[in-house]
């Protein structure tokens, strides 16, 4: 039967007639090829592709028929469709400028097959082949944005955050031009994930936290975004930005539902965290968040050591390297190195006396400390009032009226 299809195509190529008539006849041959199965179907479809890219066939007809051809292929078995897609791309390559729209469609379908097979890298590379910026065809903003986001997401799945960042940066140039709210959300999610994978944890936390307030996002996904914001904040380097983010999350009542709330509370209240208190939280982390740093410690260990060092700076005026190492559960030399780095980077106030082997912490002013304590007290009182008003709204209304009347 494949031979019959090939013969019909050869006869039609040498015949004359209007574009409409010829297109109709080619369409009949395509339908016949689709009806076949197995190796016969494969050979017949390959013959059809070879005929369509032949320069003797009018470009008007071949474009139209290749578009029809692309609509049929997703209905075929993935193994057959994949082989046909690769064959078609190879045959079209010499005339790719003439078939940009069809090539883009083929690449989108082929990428979907690779994605189903969880072959993330090949799926991404197939989409990269679409000439979104350099081709003659003008693609609309939403199509380009969606494709760049898909490529970035696929590279993330393949644990390649460097390539993912390159394509999310391209998407960044387009996202302000798009009015598609769903695409805007996809962009924010993808960008947050890229920052997370690139270990830019505080920036990722800010993005995730922003997503957790978007009403267009389902409630369960908002809570998931909040969880990621909390995890990234805990993993971030100690400093003012992280302290602000800890305060933001601690004041968000939704965080009380999260498993990591206990760690958040300890960090916000500047309490020392012991290694045995981290096991449960460490199990919640994603694989890339469990990576080790240059000194051999995990990202979580490093973040907690820095947090504990900041907490110690609020408990002591000064401390020896030996005592600091014992407090942080690390060697004295490592404690000195981390303290030195934090002071140098302006993330902790103090200075090091290497002759006596002592870290001196600068004394905080009393007023800002009182301000923080008063702020915390007011926050707790507000929480109590809200809970009372939810439990007894009528009594609350009467009490407020009585207060106003005085």
Swiss-Prot record:
What's the stated role of this polypeptide?
Component of the COP9 signalosome complex (CSN), a complex involved in various cellular and developmental processes. The CSN complex is an essential regulator of the ubiquitin (Ubl) conjugation pathway by mediating the deneddylation of the cullin subunits of SCF-type E3 ligase complexes, leading to decrease the Ubl ligase activity of SCF-type complexes such as SCF, CSA or DDB2. Also involved in the deneddylation of non-cullin subunits such as STON2.
Q: Which residues carry this modification: N-acetylalanine?
A: 2
Gene Ontology cellular-component terms for this entry are: COP9 signalosome; synaptic vesicle
N6-acetyllysine occurs at 25
List residues of the PCI domain: 197-366
Tell me which PANTHER family the record gives: 26S PROTEASOME NON-ATPASE REGULATORY SUBUNIT 12/COP9 SIGNALOSOME COMPLEX SUBUNIT 4, COP9 SIGNALOSOME COMPLEX SUBUNIT 4
Which species is listed as the source? Bos taurus
Q: Which InterPro entries match?
A: CSN4_HTH, PCI_dom, PSMD12-CSN4-like_N, PSMD12/CSN4, WH-like_DNA-bd_sf, WH_DNA-bd_sf
The subcellular location is:
Cytoplasm; Nucleus; Cytoplasmic vesicle, Secretory vesicle, Synaptic vesicle
Name of the protein in its database record: COP9 signalosome complex subunit 4
Q: Name one GO biological process term.
A: protein deneddylation
**Classification via PROSITE patterns:** PCI
Spell out the subunit comment: Component of the CSN complex, composed of COPS1/GPS1, COPS2, COPS3, COPS4, COPS5, COPS6, COPS7 (COPS7A or COPS7B), COPS8 and COPS9. In the complex, it probably interacts directly with COPS1, COPS2, COPS3, COPS5, COPS6, COPS7 (COPS7A or COPS7B) and COPS8. Interacts with TOR1A; the interaction is direct and associates TOR1A and SNAPIN with the CSN complex. Interacts with STON2; controls STON2 neddylation levels. Interacts with ERCC6.
Q: Which UniProt keywords apply?
A: Acetylation, Cytoplasm, Cytoplasmic vesicle, Nucleus, Signalosome, Synapse
Task: Say where the protein is mainly found.
Answer: cytoplasm
Q: Does the keyword GTP-binding apply?
A: no
Tell me the superkingdom of the source. Eukaryota
Q: Which family does it belong to?
A: Belongs to the CSN4 family.
Keyword check for Lipid biosynthesis: no
């Amino acid at each position: 039967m494949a031979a019959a299809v090939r013969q019909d195509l050869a006869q039609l190529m040498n015949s004359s007639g209007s574009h409409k008539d010829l297109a109709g006849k080619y369409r009949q041959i395509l339908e016949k090829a689709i009806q076949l199965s197995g190796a016969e179907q494969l050979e017949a479809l390959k013959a059809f592709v070879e005929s369509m890219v032949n320069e003797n066939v009018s470009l008007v007809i071949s474009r139209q028929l290749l578009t029809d051809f692309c609509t049929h292929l997703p209905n075929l078995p993935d193994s057959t469709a994949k082989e046909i897609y690769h064959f078609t791309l190879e045959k079209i390559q010499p005339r790719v400028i003439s078939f940009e729209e069809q090539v883009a469609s083929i690449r989108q379908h082929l990428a979907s097959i690779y994605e189903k097979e969880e072959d993330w890298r090949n799926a991404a590379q197939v989409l990269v082949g679409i000439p979104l910026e350099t081709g003659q065809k003008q693609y609309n903003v939403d199509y380009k944005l969606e494709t760049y986001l898909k490529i970035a997401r696929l590279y993330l799945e393949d644990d390649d955050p460097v390539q993912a960042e390159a394509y999310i940066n391209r998407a960044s140039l387009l996202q302000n031009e798009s009015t598609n709210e769903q695409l805007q959300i996809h962009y924010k999610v993808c960008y947050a994930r890229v920052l997370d994978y690139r270990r830019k944890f505080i920036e990722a936390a800010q993005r995730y936290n922003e997503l957790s307030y978007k009403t267009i996002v389902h409630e369960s996904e908002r809570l998931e975004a909040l969880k990621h914001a909390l995890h990234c904040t805990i993993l971030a380097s100690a400093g003012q930005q992280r302290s602000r983010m800890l305060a933001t999350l601690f004041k968000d009542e939704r965080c009380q539902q999260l498993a990591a709330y206990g760690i958040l509370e300890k960090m916000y209240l500047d309490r020392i965290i012991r290694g045995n208190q981290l096991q449960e939280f460490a199990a919640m982390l994603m694989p890339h968040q469990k990576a080790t740093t240059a000194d051999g410690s995990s990202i979580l260990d490093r973040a907690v050591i820095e947090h504990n060092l900041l907490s110690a700076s609020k408990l002591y005026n000064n401390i020896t390297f030996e005592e600091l190492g014992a407090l942080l559960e690390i060697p004295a030399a490592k404690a000195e190195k981390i303290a030195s780095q934090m002071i140098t980077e302006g993330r902790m106030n103090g200075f090091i006396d290497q002759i006596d082997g002592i870290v001196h912490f600068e004394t905080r002013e009393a007023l800002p400390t009182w301000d923080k304590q008063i702020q915390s007290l007011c926050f707790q009182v507000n929480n109590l009032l809200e809970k009372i008003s939810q439990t007894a709204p009528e009594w609350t209304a009467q009490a407020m009226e009585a207060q106003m009347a005085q």
